[in-house]
Amino acid sequence: MKIRNSLKSLKDRHRDNRVIRRRGRVYVINKTQKRFKARQG
């Protein structure tokens, strides 16, 4: 999982990327290509 300051550019890298809030953290998840997982930090 990558840790980035800004997830906006990561979200646009693949069409299946979703921005999700879990436990106060912001994540990008992708069900089809797991390598696009990222967390804002």
From Swiss-Prot:
One of its GO terms (cellular component) is ribosome. The keyword Isomerase does not apply. PROSITE patterns: RIBOSOMAL_L36. Signal peptide: none annotated. Keywords: Ribonucleoprotein, Ribosomal protein. GO terms for biological process: translation. Pfam families: Ribosomal_L36. One of its GO terms (molecular function) is structural constituent of ribosome. Belongs to the bacterial ribosomal protein bL36 family. NCBIfam families: PRK00831.1, rpmJ_bact. This is Large ribosomal subunit protein bL36. It comes from Novosphingobium aromaticivorans (strain ATCC 700278 / DSM 12444 / CCUG 56034 / CIP 105152 / NBRC 16084 / F199). The lineage of its organism: Bacteria, Pseudomonadati, Pseudomonadota, Alphaproteobacteria, Sphingomonadales.
